């Protein structure tokens, strides 16, 4: 058997390399394996109108993503044979490059929030960003998160107290945001004043104030005027105690509040006083009492609630915890090494003060921090050489983490400055809007009171002359909005003076009250850019009763609306959607001004029973609302 195989093997090898055919006939052609067209198909990706082309194999390298899985078929359009994505095409370029090269980069000019949204949509995680861009991406993302947190805190601080807030929530909100109420602001400044008084008293009581009768030695002020300082300390501690108890009672989580750093500072600031009350003045506990009095100096840390700079410093130290830990570890190693070397280098000198390695720690610390008090100096040549090396190494070790700490402090400081600037700009912008709308509304009401607006709108020439006298296009558009609201609703804008007079007349005389001249009540004006609706009753938003009842007033701003029944003009839908040429010209001459067309189903003139709508001869004093200036 083995001999037969050995004889056949050379022929098989020869046939394998093509020297000798094994079969007498020609070998059949191998079956041609047709490659699927879908494997090398060219895919067109339409991203907001921008076309991108790539191979299907390129996308299928990452099947866990949106483009690499079958989920992309949900975005396929058979008509155009494209995959359409309504996303940002600029960021998509970098995402498509990731499929091509396997490296994801972060574009520095793009918004970090938009970039994260695009990555999340296409199923990519930020951790795959290349090393060349990852650090900058993390920094930008951290800054954006801090900025969003500051904005959220600002919005929370600026919100007014909700009616559903409990007393506990109101007290905590007053402590955290003192500018929310007058009482909270007063308590904020009172506590700050007593903190300053307590710190100053703790310093002044150690100053010599002369000798008292019967004593030759000068006594400190704290002993000579013990009663006065005790009363002052008692008043400060009482304020601090009340503040701490109120914070503890109003805290959302008392357990977290007790464990917080500021809570520990508050306890340490007031605890020595209460311990001193129960301790006697014997000599056994005098040393412990003096030690407790030292802790009163920690009251100065309470200023961190009143100083933004101290809070920034605390945030900086917290963010640089790893760098500070590295600095402490490096200094500890260097101190131990150089203290040991200095001890053995000075061991042979009889006048040496390096009596032990722990005693050499003091010299090493002073030398590495470049202080050099001179109380301990090396005597030998070897000691002086190692002392010089110790001084140089201290400069290097301390200087390494300093730039990181400074950069973090600068970043946090400028971030707080930008947040303060944004808050100030937001307040100023809202104030300008309120002032502009309030001034425009007052001017509108003044024109109505004087009868100028209705007279000048009778003709096109007078209207254009009136518009030319307007202060700004904003005021013109605001007047036009108020005019359209009068024409499309059964409301009339009146000022507070007319509103009060009308209410008094309704209360005393049961007859229709006269109202101020209104554009909607003038004769001869039958068509405007907005036609008027005719309603029987209405409901005030956020009101508990219907607008037809008396006494329901929704206060929003200083402009009043009086509900009166008028003869309806044209209530057809065609008049509401009429073109600009079919209407009276607007009270503005700019060609780019658009018109707000109100297309709301108009109620029928008759009731479902077929009766005519009853006309009310008088208006209700409660059908008055106030229109917000914002």
Swiss-Prot record:
Result of changing residue 318 to A: Increases peak current amplitude and causes a positive shift in the voltage-dependence of activation
Major location (coarse): membrane
Entry-linked Gene3D superfamilies: 1.10.287.70, Potassium Channel Kv1.1, Chain A (3.30.710.10), Voltage-gated potassium channels. Chain C (1.20.120.350)
Record InterPro entries: BTB/POZ_dom (IPR000210), Ion_trans_dom (IPR005821), K_chnl_volt-dep_Kv (IPR003968), K_chnl_volt-dep_Kv4 (IPR003975), K_chnl_volt-dep_Kv4.2 (IPR004055), K_chnl_volt-dep_Kv4_C (IPR024587), Shal-type_N (IPR021645), SKP1/BTB/POZ_sf (IPR011333)
Extracellular side: 207-226, 282-287, 346-357, 378-380
Effect seen on changing residue 401 to A: May impair protein folding
Binding-site list for Zn(2+): 105, 111, 132-133
Sites where the protein binds K(+): 370-373
Reaction(s) the record says it catalyses: K(+)(in) = K(+)(out)
Effect of residue 320 to A: Increases peak current amplitude and causes a positive shift in the voltage-dependence of activation
Positions where Phosphothreonine occurs in the chain: 38, 602, 607
Entry's Gene Ontology molecular function annotations: A-type (transient outward) potassium channel activity; metal ion binding; voltage-gated monoatomic ion channel activity involved in regulation of postsynaptic membrane potential; voltage-gated potassium channel activity
PTM: Phosphorylation at Ser-438 in response to MAPK activation is increased in stimulated dendrites. Interaction with KCNIP2 and DPP6 propomtes phosphorylation by PKA at Ser-552. Phosphorylation at Ser-552 has no effect on interaction with KCNIP3, but is required for the regulation of channel activity by KCNIP3. Phosphorylation at Ser-552 leads to KCND2 internalization. Phosphorylated by MAPK in response to signaling via the metabotropic glutamate receptor GRM5. Phosphorylation at Ser-616 is required for the down-regulation of neuronal A-type currents in response to signaling via GRM5.
Residue ranges, annotated region (Interaction with KCNIP1, KCNIP2, and other family members): 2-20
Substitution effect: residue 322 to A: Increases peak current amplitude and causes a positive shift in the voltage-dependence of activation. May increase the affinity for the closed-inactivated state of the channel
Membrane topology value: Multi-pass membrane protein
Region (Interaction with KCNIP1): 71-90
Phosphoserine: modified positions: 438, 548, 552, 572, 575, 616
Domain of life: Eukaryota
Mutagenesis or variant effect for residue 320 to S: Increases peak current amplitude and slows the onset of inactivation at low voltage, but has no effect on the voltage-dependence of activation
Region span, Required for dendritic targeting: 474-489
Annotated family: Belongs to the potassium channel family. D (Shal) (TC 1.A.1.2) subfamily. Kv4.2/KCND2 sub-subfamily.
Described function: Voltage-gated potassium channel that mediates transmembrane potassium transport in excitable membranes, primarily in the brain. Mediates the major part of the dendritic A-type current I(SA) in brain neurons. This current is activated at membrane potentials that are below the threshold for action potentials.
Extra remark beyond the main annotation: The transient neuronal A-type potassium current called I(SA) is triggered at membrane potentials that are below the threshold for action potentials. It inactivates rapidly and recovers rapidly from inactivation. It regulates the firing of action potentials and plays a role in synaptic integration and plasticity. Potassium channels containing KCND2 account for about 80% of the neuronal A-type potassium current. In contrast, the potassium channel responsible for the cardiac I(to) current differs between species; it is mediated by KCND2 in rodents. Is specifically and reversibly inhibited by the scorpion toxin Ts8 (AC P69940).
Record remark: domains: The transmembrane segment S4 functions as a voltage-sensor and is characterized by a series of positively charged amino acids at every third position. Channel opening and closing is effected by a conformation change that affects the position and orientation of the voltage-sensor paddle formed by S3 and S4 within the membrane. A transmembrane electric field that is positive inside would push the positively charged S4 segment outwards, thereby opening the pore, while a field that is negative inside would pull the S4 segment inwards and close the pore.
Protein name (Swiss-Prot/TrEMBL): A-type voltage-gated potassium channel KCND2
Organism field: Homo sapiens
Phylogenetic lineage: Eukaryota, Metazoa, Chordata, Craniata, Vertebrata
């Amino acid at each position: 058997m083995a001999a037969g195989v050995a004889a056949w093997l050379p022929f098989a090898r020869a046939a394998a390399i093509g020297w000798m055919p094994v079969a007498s006939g020609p070998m059949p052609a191998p079956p041609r394996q047709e490659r699927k067209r879908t494997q090398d198909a060219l895919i067109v990706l339409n991203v907001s109108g921008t076309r991108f082309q790539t191979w299907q194999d390129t996308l299928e390298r990452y099947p866990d993503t949106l483009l690499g899985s079958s989920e992309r078929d949900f975005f396929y359009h058979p008509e155009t044979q494209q995959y359409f994505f309504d996303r940002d095409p600029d960021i998509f370029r970098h995402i498509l490059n990731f499929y091509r090269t396997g490296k994801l980069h972060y574009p520095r000019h793009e918004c970090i929030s938009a970039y994260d949204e695009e990555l999340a949509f296409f199923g990519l995680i930020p951790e795959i960003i290349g090393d060349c861009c990852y650090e900058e991406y993390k920094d930008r993302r951290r800054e954006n998160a801090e900025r969003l947190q500051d904005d959220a805190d600002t919005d929370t601080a600026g919100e007014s107290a909700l009616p559903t807030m409990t007393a506990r929530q109101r007290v905590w909100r007053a402590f955290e945001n003192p500018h929310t109420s007058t009482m909270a602001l007063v308590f904020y400044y009172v506590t700050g004043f007593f903190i300053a008084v307590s710190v100053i008293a703790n310093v002044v009581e150690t100053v010599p104030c002369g000798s008292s009768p019967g004593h030759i030695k000068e006594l400190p002020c704290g002993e000579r005027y013990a009663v006065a300082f005790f009363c002052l300390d008692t008043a400060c501690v009482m304020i601090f105690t009340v503040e701490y108890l109120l914070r503890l009672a109003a805290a959302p989580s008392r357990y977290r509040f007790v464990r917080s750093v500021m809570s520990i500072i508050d306890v340490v600031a007031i605890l020595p006083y209460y311990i001193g009350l129960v301790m006697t003045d014997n000599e056994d506990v005098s040393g412990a009492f003096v030690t407790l009095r030292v802790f009163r100096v920690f009251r100065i840390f309470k200023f961190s609630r009143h100083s933004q700079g101290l809070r920034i410093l605390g945030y900086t130290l917290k963010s640089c915890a790893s760098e500070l830990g590295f600095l402490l570890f490096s200094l500890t190693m260097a101190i131990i090494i150089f203290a040991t070397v200095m001890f053995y280098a000075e061991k042979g000198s009889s006048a040496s003060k390096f009596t032990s390695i722990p005693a050499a720690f003091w010299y090493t610390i002073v030398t590495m921090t470049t202080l050099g008090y001179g109380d301990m100096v090396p005597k030998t040549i070897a000691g002086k050489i190692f002392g010089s090396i110790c001084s140089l190494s201290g400069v290097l070790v301390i200087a390494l983490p300093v730039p990181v700490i400074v950069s973090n402090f600068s970043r946090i400081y400028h971030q707080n400055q930008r947040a303060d600037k944004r808050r100030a700009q937001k307040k100023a912008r809202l104030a300008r809007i309120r002032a502009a709308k309030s001034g425009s509304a007052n001017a509108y009401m003044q024109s109505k009171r004087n009868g100028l607006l209705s007279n000048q709108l009778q003709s096109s020439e007078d209207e254009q002359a009136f518009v030319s006298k307007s202060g700004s296009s904003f005021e013109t558009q605001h007047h036009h909005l108020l005019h359209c609201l009068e024409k499309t609703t059964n409301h009339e804008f009146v000022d507070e003076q007319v509103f009060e007079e009308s209410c008094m007349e309704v209360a005393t005389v049961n007859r229709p009250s006269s109202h101020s001249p209104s554009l909607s009540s003038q004769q001869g004006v039958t068509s405007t850019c907005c036609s008027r609706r005719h309603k029987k009753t209405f409901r005030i938003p956020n009101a508990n009763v219907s607008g037809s009842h008396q006494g329901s007033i929704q206060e929003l701003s200083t402009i009043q609306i009086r509900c009166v029944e008028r003869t309806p003009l044209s209530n057809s839908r065609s008049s509401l959607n009429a073109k600009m040429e079919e209407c009276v010209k607007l009270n503005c001459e700019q060609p780019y001004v658009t018109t707000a067309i109100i297309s709301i189903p108009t109620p029928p003139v008759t009731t479902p029973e077929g009766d005519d709508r009853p006309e009310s001869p008088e208006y209700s004093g409660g059908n008055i609302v106030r229109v917000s200036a914002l």
